[in-house]
Amino acid sequence: MIRNGNQVTYETRGETLVIHVGGEIDHHSAVAVRTGIDEKIASERPQKVMLELSGVDFMDSSGLGLIMGRYALVKQYGGTLSVLDPSPAVVKIIKLAGMERMVSILRTKTKQ
């Protein structure tokens, strides 16, 4: 699905929902991206959610809100949320916000 220039695709791996997000996550796009993700999480109620953010080339505080809101949503269902293969831009803002203490960052790809 493409919304506001962002590409969001979903992949289910057993009890894990992998959400691939590409493009920019800012105040212009975050609401549309968040709405689609929330609908998918609510319908599937996965035990694990992985936000795969290797294709995100820009993220501002709206992106941090998107991650933390999904973290809280998944936690309500007893699940966990991780950030998978974040781009350097995403890692930078997550670390600046101190969020790596709350949300695990997983890497399956070698650093770029």
Task: Give the label of every model feature segment.
Residues M1-D57, A72-Q112:
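STAS-like cytosolic regulatory interaction modules
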Residues I67-Y71:
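Histidine-anchored nucleotide/phosphate-binding helix
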